[in-house]
Amino acid sequence: MDWLREAADGSLVLSLHVQPGAKKTEFVGPHGEAMKLRLAAPPVDGKANAALTVFLAAFCGVGRSAVSLLSGETSRAKRVRIEGAGSEALARLRALG
């Protein structure tokens, strides 16, 4: 899985292709070397990035502050770090594809 990596410090690094303005927020499936994610939030004033952070934190069972955007603040291609995600969260992410 090229889109999901474990860093040396134990955090997870995700490569995502984000589609803002969708009907609902959900993982779609592989998109090249990234995982495609639809976001219900519009790409205006950072709302999509905030929604992404909230969604990933809830999906992985971590606090919102544990999710940080590494790159792609204004792009659909994003790299995200998730700190403190346990083995259950890793298994859920791996099950996506």
Swiss-Prot record:
| InterPro entries the UniProt entry points to | DUF167, YggU-like_sf
Regarding protein family, the annotation reads: Belongs to the UPF0235 family.
GO CC list = cytoplasm
Naturally occurring in which organism (per UniProt): Aromatoleum aromaticum (strain DSM 19018 / LMG 30748 / EbN1)
What protein am I looking at? UPF0235 protein AZOSEA09540
Q: What Pfam families would the database entry show?
A: DUF167
Coiled-coil positions = none
**What are the boundaries of the signal sequence?**
none
